[in-house]
């Protein structure tokens, strides 16, 4: 998946740390673990930003080898507990506390690994949560459930704002 250079949410999601494991010993990269001047040993587990981890995971060590510099591990935001919680009750999930750019990073991860199941789960969650977002944005006169609003990730916050603004404009248009 290509990144959008001008999208701040895309830049922030590329900076999210992903768990990785080095397949070889690399001299001089000890600073990644807090050991400047040292090597990073084979089988070292470390978290790297997605933009770097993605490149190191696809770059092969040599033309003869199929092995890459690192292997990516499944991140916490898509572990089985989170996915099961989403399947159980997507509306009550606090996406913001899990990951502020949950949809962006899920999209990137699913694209990297062709993870159809993740795409389906996230799309179903978006449908369920969008219905609630629309309800809150449409009912300006009702007291807003702040807990739900605070649980929205950045994409959902934009969706809430657009929906709310659209509803205000429609009410204004109907009034005039």
Curated annotation (Swiss-Prot):
Naturally occurring in which organism (per UniProt): Debaryomyces hansenii (strain ATCC 36239 / CBS 767 / BCRC 21394 / JCM 1990 / NBRC 0083 / IGC 2968) (Yeast)
Keyword Secreted: no
Single GO cellular component term: chromatin
Chief location category: nucleus
Domain of life the protein comes from: Eukaryota
Keyword terms: DNA replication, Nucleus
Gene3D superfamilies, alphabetized: 1.20.58.2050
Compartments, record wording: Nucleus
Family the UniProt entry places it in: Belongs to the GINS3/PSF3 family.
Keyword Nucleus in annotation: yes
Name of this chain's protein: DNA replication complex GINS protein PSF3
Disulfide linkage: none
GO biological process, one term: mitotic DNA replication initiation
